[in-house]
Structure formats: C-alpha cells, structure tokens
C-alpha cells in the first residue's frame, strides 16, 4: 500500500555532504520525493517533533544537535514507505547498524546518526503535519 513518511536528513548529513548519497538510496528503492526543504529549525519545532522525548535526560543534547545547523526535511511516498525507510536507515545507534544501511555505512555516533524516519503511519501523519502543514 502506498504511504507517505517523513524523513529528516539531520545537520550531520548536511554538514558532511551526504544528502545526495542518502536521497539516492531512497529513490533507488522506488520511493518518490513528494516535498523537500532545507531549513534550520528552532527549539520549538524540535520540541514539537520530539514531544515524547522532551522530558528525557538525553533530549537537551539532541535538541541542541538538531537545531545547530541546517537539515533537510522531506516527505517520501511509496509502497510500505515507513518500513522501507526504517530498513534503509538501519539501527538508531550507528555503531550497531548493519553494513549496507545508511547509518551502518555513514554514521559516526549514536547521536549524530544522520537520519530520522517516522516509526509508524500514525507518526508519519503527525510529523508531516508539523513539517509540511497542508500537505
């Protein structure tokens, strides 16, 4: 079933010049870019996006990281896009991600793990509403 999902190419991906390499992996799996924008976000957007983590100990450094430089937000569409993106991204901790995944091949640390992908169709809908209202 064709679904939409939100992907963030985090500031480390932009800083390291990996945007094209990462996008090509999604496109090679048949996912279509529906919307894409590079921007720098403020703490309010980060807090809205990561609402379930705001009170957790690890969150302040994560917020500083995602607000510390430009990122690329995009909506991808395709068959089972949520699951496909999560498989392509690999394990959240890049040191544990399998080779052949985006994080396994390019990630340098757990926090600077290059990408975010929605974890469910419901999360995708909520996150797309934050990043691309009206889409």
UniProtKB/Swiss-Prot annotation:
Q: Which reaction does it catalyse?
A: a 2'-deoxyribonucleoside 5'-diphosphate + ATP = a 2'-deoxyribonucleoside 5'-triphosphate + ADP; a ribonucleoside 5'-diphosphate + ATP = a ribonucleoside 5'-triphosphate + ADP
Its Gene Ontology molecular function terms? ATP binding; metal ion binding; nucleoside diphosphate kinase activity
**GO CC annotation terms, alphabetical:** cytoplasm
- Cofactors, names only: Mg(2+)
Among its keywords, does the record have Glycosyltransferase?
A: no
Task: State the SMART domains in the record.
Answer: NDK
Subunit and partners = Homotetramer.
Q: Which UniProt keywords apply?
A: ATP-binding, Cytoplasm, Kinase, Magnesium, Metal-binding, Nucleotide metabolism, Nucleotide-binding, Phosphoprotein, Transferase
The entry assigns this protein to a family as follows: Belongs to the NDK family.
Biological role stated in the UniProt entry: Major role in the synthesis of nucleoside triphosphates other than ATP. The ATP gamma phosphate is transferred to the NDP beta phosphate via a ping-pong mechanism, using a phosphorylated active-site intermediate.
Task: Please name the catalytic residues of this protein.
Answer: 116 (pros-phosphohistidine intermediate)
Enumerate the InterPro entries for this protein.
Answer: NDK-like_dom (IPR034907), NDK-like_dom_sf (IPR036850), Nucleoside_diP_kinase (IPR001564), Nucleoside_diP_kinase_AS (IPR023005)
What Pfam family does this protein match (any one)? NDK
EC identifiers of the protein = 2.7.4.6
Which positions in this protein are listed as binding ATP?
Answer: 10, 58, 86, 92, 103, 113
**Localization, UniProt:** Cytoplasm
Q: What is its main location?
A: cytoplasm
Q: What is this protein called?
A: Nucleoside diphosphate kinase
Class of this enzyme: transferase
């Amino acid at each position: 079933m064709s679904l939409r999902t939100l992907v963030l190419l985090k500031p480390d991906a932009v800083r390291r010049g990996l945007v094209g390499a990462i996008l090509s992996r999604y496109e090679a799996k048949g996912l279509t870019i529906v919307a894409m924008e590079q921007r720098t976000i403020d703490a309010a957007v980060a807090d809205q996006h990561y609402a379930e983590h705001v009170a957790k100990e690890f969150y302040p450094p994560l917020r500083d990281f995602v607000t510390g430089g430009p990122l690329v937000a995009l909506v991808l569409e395709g068959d089972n896009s949520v699951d496909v993106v999560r498989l392509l991204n690999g394990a959240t901790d890049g040191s544990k991600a399998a080779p052949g995944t985006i994080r396994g091949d390019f990630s340098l640390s757990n926090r600077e793990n290059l990408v975010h992908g929605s974890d469910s169709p419901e999360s995708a809908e909520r996150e797309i509403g934050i990043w691309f209202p009206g889409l």
